[in-house]
Amino acid sequence: MSRPTATLVLRNAVVATCDRGPSDAGLLPGAAVAVEGRRVAWVGRDRDLEAEVNAGGAQVIDARGGLVTPGLVDSHTHLVFAGERAGEFALRCAGRSYLQVALSGGGIAVTTRATRAAPDEQLLADAAARARRLIAQGVTTIEVKSGYGLDAPEELRLLRIVHRLGDALGGDATILPTLLFHAVPPEQVGDRAGFVREACASLIPQVARERLAGFCDVFVEDGAFAPDEARLLLQAAKDRGLVPRVHAEQLTAGGGARLAAELGCSSADHLEELDDAGVAALAEARVVAGLLPLSTLFLGSERYAPARRLLEAGVPVSLATNMNPGSAMSENVGLTLSLACLKLGLTPAEALVAFTAGGARALRQPDLGRIARGADADLVLWGCGSPEHLAWHMAVNHALAVVKHGRVVHQAPAVAMVDCR
């Protein structure tokens, strides 16, 4: 077999392939990765590079003992919104709960009003700025939900903005749009059944027809959608070729996890109030459990998702930021990794795999989240030599170079380069 001709090489690295299961980062010390075009062409021992790869004309990055991982996959975000909820944050700091604030006219309703009033270009620019902050921290794939428009015209508008986001970023990240049913629009709260029927008959088919989203997500929660309502929406989405997902068991045990298992959802996210029956249902159906620890921290709760029980039951897990204005106003990747270890009980290796291969699985993207021949060349060089260091040095951006489809899309200043050997 002829040697691949590399266009980019990262060498003298500790490579984490993230392709050996949920608890093994697949660490290869003294390793190199060769990229040909948009794909990984070879990964192996650095000393074997010249014999295995034609790298004479390649761009070479000397990792100096640094960790090289797959690009992170942020599988749950709400980047498209306007306005702020700082006042609501202050109320919660004074003792009001998230549900109390929402029921008194705050919460999603505040963001919906601001988002509906904002012009497209403002929403796009703000979403792009948030995405850029994620990219600079090693995220190369971002799932982006609609959900703050609530009614059909606004949800369609938001999804079209999400579609423009990839171009606005110049291809520096893959953007995967999701149609999110966040709550019943205020104009239709008196006819919930009518809203669901209309969404199933009109909105979902239009989203599928125009290919505005690959996923459909429903917030199954008190004050949002009941399981029976969510079942109708998600089944209609499945029938139109959209992949179903759910927000489940975040604030109350509402049955969302069992619904996810019943419908074969790609993921059930949040799960702070998940019970043993829900764990068993997710395990049997092989639904990915989406872990979002920034939300638990931001809401001032100590009820984190039962990550260890999920892993021990054989449930695949993902880790994501859940960046949104109400329950996780942060794009901090490092803090997310640290919380996964400190509060969810994951090892640093498990947290890294969940943020790479786990996110790819939740989004059904088999060529993402791993370093292997033929996989997408989405890579990150970190200014440290291990997953443990990433989680230990909290809330710091350790990303030195970010590669998307074989192209360096972000590089830290030279002063940030460190020798990890």
Swiss-Prot record:
The cofactor note reads:
Binds 1 zinc or iron ion per subunit.
Q: What Enzyme Commission number does this protein have? A: 3.5.2.7
Cellular component aspect of the GO annotation: cytoplasm
Compartment list: Cytoplasm
Where on this chain does N-formimidoyl-L-glutamate bind?
148, 324, 326
Amino acids binding 4-imidazolone-5-propanoate:
85, 148, 182, 250, 327
Q: Which reaction does it catalyse?
A: 4-imidazolone-5-propanoate + H2O = N-formimidoyl-L-glutamate
Binding of Zn(2+) occurs at 76, 78, 247
Biological process terms from the Gene Ontology for this record are: L-histidine catabolic process to glutamate and formamide; L-histidine catabolic process to glutamate and formate
Describe the task this protein carries out.
Catalyzes the hydrolytic cleavage of the carbon-nitrogen bond in imidazolone-5-propanoate to yield N-formimidoyl-L-glutamate. It is the third step in the universal histidine degradation pathway.
Q: What is this protein called?
A: Imidazolonepropionase
Q: Which organism does this sequence originate in?
A: Anaeromyxobacter sp. (strain K)
